[in-house]
């Protein structure tokens, strides 16, 4: 299973790195994902959750 937030759906994004001369090369931006235990269908489960979802209170740890 890929690293993706189960709450917000955030995952790695790709784009270009640009030098001073505006040459481009591919790079990725990785989401700040934490593996936490939360209740899924009434049972505790370890899943990937973004730090943004944890800070905003969208999910509560068990």
UniProtKB/Swiss-Prot annotation:
Belongs to the bacterial ribosomal protein bL28 family. GO terms for biological process: translation. This is Large ribosomal subunit protein bL28. Residues 10-20 have a biased composition (Basic residues). One of its GO terms (molecular function) is structural constituent of ribosome. The keyword Flavoprotein does not apply. GO terms for cellular component: ribonucleoprotein complex; ribosome. Residues 1-27 are annotated as: Disordered. InterPro entries: Bacterial_rp_bL28, Ribosomal_bL28, Ribosomal_bL28/bL31-like_sf, Ribosomal_bL28_bact-type, Ribosomal_bL28_sf. Keywords: Ribonucleoprotein, Ribosomal protein. Signal peptide: none annotated. The keyword Ribosomal protein applies. It comes from Listeria monocytogenes serovar 1/2a (strain ATCC BAA-679 / EGD-e). Transmembrane segments: none annotated.
């Amino acid at each position: 299973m890929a690293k993706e937030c189960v709450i917000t759906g955030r995952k790695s994004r790709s784009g270009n790195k640009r030098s001073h001369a505006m040459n481009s090369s591919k790079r990725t931006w990785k989401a700040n994902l934490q593996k936490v235990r939360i209740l899924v269908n009434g049972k505790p489960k370890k899943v990937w959750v973004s730090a943004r979802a944890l800070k905003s209170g969208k999910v509560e740890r068990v």
